[in-house]
């Protein structure tokens, strides 16, 4: 892995970022410094090349053909398929977000090849936003991840735990009678039916886990490294329902991984 904190990001008029997740894939067109134009499709669609050609073609007709493309993927089987498809469509090399790139932070990790592309992108964007402050980056998605950077941009470590839907799904799939429940904010702490009890248990359990871990990490940064102000950035599909319950957060941005991928794309262009 490389660190290049002073590296400049290239200015490319039209850039495409494809964020391939376990459930859904988000496509973002970045034009200059404007807010990206974003669309989402089921990740399973990557098995249908004709449909994806149509999706990418429509985006290109609407926004112009991309001059630079990045894939941020946590699904290895879809990474190669997506990269080949995009290169054949636009005749542009596709950058895959991985540990071999230049970063605005220093990744000190025992197994860098296992560090998820989404986590790399989120760390990059977190460092970009808070270049001289420690930051806790939390992604509340299929899995919930925590990654920590110190004041000078050193990676201090992280945590990974099951996400909301994974917890609810496990209760259903690993038991004989518990139903599958869609999790949203319960009306009260205690449930009065099995469905309500599952919803309350998963939702408030995740809230307390995330809030407690953020507080514990903040305490470690203050005690062990002498940090004073610790920033917290939160992203992920379930971030909006959780963040109001967990205390002070510096930034909530569901597009943070896309923005970080775009930053890394511009930093790593030849």
Swiss-Prot record:
CDD domains for the chain = ASKHA_NBD_PanK-III
Entry binding sites for K(+): 139
Provide GO CC annotations from the record: cytoplasm
Q: Which UniProt keywords apply?
A: ATP-binding, Coenzyme A biosynthesis, Cytoplasm, Kinase, Metal-binding, Nucleotide-binding, Potassium, Transferase
Its annotated pathway reads: Cofactor biosynthesis; coenzyme A biosynthesis; CoA from (R)-pantothenate: step 1/5
Q: Which InterPro entries match?
A: ATPase_NBD, Type_III_PanK
Question: Which cofactor is essential here?
Answer: NH4(+); K(+)
Asked if the keyword Transport belongs to this entry, the reply reads no
Reaction catalysed?
A: (R)-pantothenate + ATP = (R)-4'-phosphopantothenate + ADP + H(+)
Kindly list the positions annotated as binding substrate: 109, 116-119, 194
Gene Ontology BP terms: coenzyme A biosynthetic process
Enzyme class, spelled out = transferase
The UniProt entry annotates the active site at 118 (proton acceptor)
Q: Where does ATP bind?
A: 19-26, 142
- Pfam families, from UniProt? Pan_kinase (PF03309)
Q: Enumerate the subcellular locations listed in this protein's record, separating them with semicolons.
A: Cytoplasm
- Gene Ontology MF annotations: ATP binding; metal ion binding; pantothenate kinase activity
EC no.? 2.7.1.33
Q: What does this protein do?
A: Catalyzes the phosphorylation of pantothenate (Pan), the first step in CoA biosynthesis.
Q: Which HAMAP family match?
A: Pantothen_kinase_3 (MF_01274)
> Subunit structure of this entry?
Homodimer.
What family is this?
Belongs to the type III pantothenate kinase family.
Give the protein name, as stated in the record.
Type III pantothenate kinase
Native species of this protein? Chlorobaculum tepidum (strain ATCC 49652 / DSM 12025 / NBRC 103806 / TLS)
Q: Which gene encodes it?
A: coaX
């Amino acid at each position: 892995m490389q660190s290049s904190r002073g590296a400049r990001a290239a200015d490319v008029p039209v850039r495409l970022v494809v964020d391939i997740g376990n459930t859904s894939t988000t496509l973002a067109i970045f034009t200059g410094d404007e807010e990206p134009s974003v669309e989402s499709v089921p990740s399973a669609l990557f098995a249908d090349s004709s449909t994806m050609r149509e999706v990418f073609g429509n985006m290109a007709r609407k926004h112009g053909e991309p001059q630079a493309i990045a894939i941020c993927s946590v699904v290895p089987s879809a990474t190669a398929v997506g990269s080949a498809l995009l290169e054949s469509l636009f005749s542009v090399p596709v950058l895959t977000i991985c540990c071999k790139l230049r970063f605005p932070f220093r990744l000190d990790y025992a197994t860098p090849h296992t560090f998820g592309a989404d986590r790399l992108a989120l760390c990059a964007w977190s460092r970009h936003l808070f270049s001289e402050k420690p930051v806790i980056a939390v992604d509340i998605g299929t899995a919930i991840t925590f990654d920590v950077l110190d004041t000078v941009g050193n990676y201090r470590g992280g945590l990974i735990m099951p996400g909301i839907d994974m917890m609810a799904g496990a209760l259903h799939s690993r038991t004989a009678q518990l139903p599958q429940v869609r999790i949203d904010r319960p009306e009260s702490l205690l449930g009065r039916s099995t469905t309500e009890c599952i919803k309350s248990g998963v939702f408030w359990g995740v809230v307390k886990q995330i809030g407690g871990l953020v507080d514990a990490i903040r305490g470690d940064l203050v005690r062990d490294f002498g940090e004073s102000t610790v920033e917290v950035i939160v992203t992920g599909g379930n971030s909006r329902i959780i963040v109001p319950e967990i205390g002070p957060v510096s930034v909530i941005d569901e597009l943070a991984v896309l923005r970080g991928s775009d930053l890394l794309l511009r930093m790593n262009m030849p």
